Amino acid sequence: MIELKNVTKTFEDVVAIDNVSCKIPEGCIYGMVGSNGAGKSTALRTLCGVYKAEQGEVLFDERPVFDNTEVKKDLVFISDDLYFINAASPKRMAKLYKRIYPDFDYERFWELLDYFKLDKNKSIGTFSKGMKRQTAMVLALSCKPKYLFLDETFDGLDPVARKFIKSLIYNDVAERNMTTVVTSHSLRELEDLCDSLLLLHKGKVVLESDIGDLKQDNYKVQVAFDYDYDKSLFDELEIFDFEKKGSVSNFIVSAKEQDVKKILNSKKPVLLDILPLSLEEVFTIKMRDLGYDFDECLEVKEDEK
């Protein structure tokens, strides 16, 4: 298990992360989300031992990570700002990785290079942004690490490459019990990938939860009746965002699905649809309850709404 215990990291007079605590179970995919400047990258770098926390502890199975080569030999970190040796080719980078990570799997490396159609002898500096991301992921996954840390790694990848890389991560988690921590400013990017999510805003933890728990017992409902009614008809339920147009009402409800069906069916609807909420919709509700504005924390763009 990885633990952050009351971790604070500052840069001069700027508090990048403030008293952050979380527990990351072994063999899970853990997401950190937040807007630009929320502290995601700083938290991840502190987690990896790139930065030293001024306060608190970062522990891997009770072992501190900072300046600990025994821990760091089991982890691979891909920064949002990729770095490769000047003029190095994928083949040359693989030789370097093999020296650092003895379990580096050349067979897997060649297979993944071939899949992405990356020239093993060409300078990585001449690659496009997406190809550089692919190369970084090929090298990282070929190391077969115990811990994989990804900072905005899916940025710049096309949908096909993104889906394939996610499948590789899933397989390594399932087969080798690899622990993965990934940051993103997009909930939608992580919704189908992560087991748990941590939301950061201005360096502080807003919310941490298992995705399954977040989505459980939250639904959106569309219902219609052939008689006149108002919101009071649903007083037996805990509902949010109620809207009524003509005879049709839409709202969000927090309750068990079977209870919602039983209560609403007893009122003789002519239309009843009960659908699960998206992760974004659940976060909106949870954050509103905590007094936060979802759009401010995640910087949701108009074309993403």
What function would you assign to each model-found segment?
Residues 30-35:
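The feature captures the beta-strand-to-loop junction immediately N-terminal to the Walker
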Residues 56-71:
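Conserved ABC transporter NBD signature motif
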Residues 79-135:
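ABC-family P-loop ATPase nucleotide-binding domains
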Residues 148-152:
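Catalytic Walker B motif of ABC-type/P-loop ATPase nucleotide-binding domains
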Residues 165-255:
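ABC transporter nucleotide-binding domain
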Residues 247, 252-305:
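C-terminal coupling/interaction segments
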